[in-house]
Amino acid sequence: MRISPLGIFCWNRDLESTSQFAKQDAALTHPHPVCIQANALFAMAIAQLISSRKSTQETYEDIKVWASELKVEKTLMKAILDAPGSLPADYVSMQGWVIIAFQNALWQLLNAPSLEEGVVDTVMRGGDTDTNAAIAGALLGAAYGRDAVPKQWVEKILSCRPKAGESRVRRPRPECFWPVDAIELARSLTTLGA
């Protein structure tokens, strides 16, 4: 889930560097080979979608090639190959497992009619909804661009100020974690990556 900004940052870098950065990042806290490999593929896909504006189908075909070149684990390759025609079978009992999130994101990339419908469909399937939706949303956002994000979602994010003591705030956050500068952060990532 946290690898998406790295994919944005690497939009103008070669895919090998993007892959290595993503693997190193995953290894810090999620050293399982499947997670490391999925991280690399995901960051590469985001970077390529932003830089090349390839179609979703072309990107999916590239992901298959990259997965073969990386010699990914069988469970990950199966999820990649199954993604165009089927969603994960069980979102709930295996929630939090990268295979579920990755296969879902690929299915949404290839089948969802819009970013909004892909994210909403993901959430409606249950399980680890925030993770799965963040991953699918990042991939769809890279494919369709910032303007594909519903305006009401953007408004909610940019006005979110969960200040302690406010009547409607159940989980206050320090001001440095408020998402009010999310668009500027994304712009900064693309500028730094250039």
Model-identified regions with their sequence ranges:
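Phosphate/ribose-phosphate-bearing ligand recognition and processing surfaces
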Residues: 1, 16-39, 53, 130
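All-alpha helical catalytic cores of prenyl diphosphate-utilizing isoprenoid enzymes
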Residues: 3-18, 71
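Catalytic phosphate/nucleotide-handling subdomain of diverse soluble enzymes
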Residues: 6, 10, 22-25, 36-44, ...
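Extended, well-ordered alpha-helical scaffold segments
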Residues: 18-21, 59-64, 153-156
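Short, structured coil/loop segments at alpha-helix boundaries
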Residues: 32, 36, 67-81, 150, ...
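Accessory "access/gating" subregions that flank catalytic or transport cores
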Residues: 47-126, 143, 187-193
